[in-house]
Amino acid sequence: MVYISNGQVLDSRNQSPWRVSFLTDFFWGIAEFVVFFFKTLLQQDVKKRRGYGSSSDSRYDDGRGPPGNPPRRMGRISHLRGPSPPPMAGGUGR
């Protein structure tokens, strides 16, 4: 890419892609990515502390917690069954 610096037209192809400033910027970019990645893994409540939580998060602030699971039904639900599957193919080959 061509650019102008101090009144001179310069071409970026003349610069090495492995110059020191590029390598240090690349290193710090990778380091920041790793730090932020592990911060998000270890701090799951970061949304609540920064005010991004939804209003539904405040429903259980009285200490009761969310309601438990509904009671388990005994037996099978037969009225929602569809047609029975077709018989298995194969046989004894005679």
UniProtKB/Swiss-Prot annotation:
| Topology within the bilayer | Single-pass membrane protein
Query: In its keyword annotation, does this UniProt entry include Transport?
Result: yes
Matches recorded under InterPro entries? Se_SelK/SelG
Q: Which GO terms describe its cellular component?
A: endoplasmic reticulum membrane; plasma membrane
UniProt-recorded Gene Ontology molecular function terms: identical protein binding
Quote the tissue specificity entry: High expression in spleen and intestine (at protein level). Expressed in a range of immune cells including T and B-cells and also in myeloid cells including macrophages, neutrophils and dendritic cells (at protein level).
Q: Which UniProt keywords apply?
A: Calcium, Calcium transport, Cell membrane, Endoplasmic reticulum, Ion transport, Membrane, Selenocysteine, Transmembrane, Transmembrane helix, Transport, Ubl conjugation
For this protein, the record's Pfam families field holds: SelK_SelG (PF10961)
Q: What induces it?
A: By increased dietary selenium. Expression is significantly decreased by a low selenium diet.
Task: Decide whether keyword Glycosyltransferase is in the record.
Answer: no
- Renumbered to this chain, region (Disordered) spans 46-94
Recount the PTM note.
Cleaved by CAPN2/m-calpain in resting macrophages but not in activated macrophages. Macrophage activation up-regulates expression of the calpain inhibitor CAST/calpastatin, resulting in inhibition of CAPN2 activity. Truncated SELENOK proteins produced by failed UGA/Sec decoding are ubiquitinated by the CRL2(KLHDC2) complex, which recognizes the diglycine (Gly-Gly) at the C-terminus of truncated SELENOK proteins.
Gene Ontology biological-process annotations:
calcium ion transport; establishment of localization in cell; intrinsic apoptotic signaling pathway in response to endoplasmic reticulum stress; macrophage derived foam cell differentiation; neutrophil migration; positive regulation of chemokine production; positive regulation of defense response to virus by host; positive regulation of interleukin-6 production
Q: What happens when the gene is disrupted?
A: Normal growth, fertility and immune system development. Reduced receptor-mediated Ca(2+) flux in T-cells, neutrophils and macrophages. Reduced T-cell proliferation and reduced T-cell and neutrophil migration. Decreased viral clearance and increased mortality following infection with West Nile virus. Bone marrow-derived macrophages from knockout mice display decreased uptake of acetylated or oxidized low-density lipoprotein, reduced foam cell formation and decreased palmitoylation and cell surface expression of CD36.
Q: Annotated site (Cleavage), which positions? A: R81, G82
Where do transmembrane segments lie in this chain?
20-42
The subcellular location is:
Endoplasmic reticulum membrane; Cell membrane
> Family per UniProt?
Belongs to the selenoprotein K family.
What is the protein's known function? Answer: Required for Ca(2+) flux in immune cells and plays a role in T-cell proliferation and in T-cell and neutrophil migration. Involved in endoplasmic reticulum-associated degradation (ERAD) of soluble glycosylated proteins. Required for palmitoylation and cell surface expression of CD36 and involved in macrophage uptake of low-density lipoprotein and in foam cell formation. Together with ZDHHC6, required for palmitoylation of ITPR1 in immune cells, leading to regulate ITPR1 stability and function. Plays a role in protection of cells from ER stress-induced apoptosis.
Subunit comment for this entry? Interacts with DERL1, DERL2, DERL3 and SELENOS. The SELENOK-SELENOS complex interacts with VCP. Interacts with ZDHHC6.
Protein known as: Selenoprotein K
Gene name, per UniProt, is: Selenok
